[in-house]
Amino acid sequence: KLTKHKNGLSSKKKIIGQLIITVITFVFIWKYGLINPRIDFSIVNPILKNSYFYITPVLFFVFMAVVIIGSSNAVNLTDGLDGLVTGPIIIVCFTLAIITYLTGHIEYAKYLNLNYVVDSGEMVVFLVAIIGASIGFLWYNFYPAQVFMGDTGSLTLGGLLAIVVIFIKQELLLPVTGFIFIVEALS
């Protein structure tokens, strides 16, 4: 027999789950040689070309944890109760789809001074699928709402955005494109 719990998961269990996702992502990046200890500032500040600094793998893991946990919780706070996060998610995914496409082509990446990431163009399909799912969600979320996103949707979307920017090595782009998430989290 299933019992109903009105409280859901505690915040401690949610953070532990997010740390598990961070560990899985780090192991995947490490195993496939995608780890890049170079944090690039050139997309955030295009005036200073080749502005970056190196960090150790342990600090990179801590940085990844901050990006993934911070992003997923900021998106969750932006969501509120009625799917308010869907509009910003569509905008951020569209922006990331363009940047991901550009990082997947060596000529564009070199011309725009971006890190070239082999086969990152495949993630464009994933980001466009998130856009399509979000538009479909909006259709059923208008009054009277038939579908609610909840923590499951908003935490997942925030984590997925973080993982995409980590894979394309543009971690500092997320605060720029998702500025609304930061403002909402700080309010």
Q: Where are the regions a protein language model picked out?
A:
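Membrane-water interface regions at transmembrane-helix termini and the short interhelical loops
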Residues: K1-L2, S71-T78
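Membrane-interfacial loop-to-helix junctions in multi-pass inner-membrane proteins
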Residues: L2-G17
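Non-catalytic accessory segments adjacent to catalytic cores
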Residues: I20-I24
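Alpha-helical transmembrane segments
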Residues: T25-P46, L59, F63-M64, I68-S72, ...
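RNA/tRNA-interacting regions in translation and RNA-turnover enzymes
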Residues: L77, L81-V85
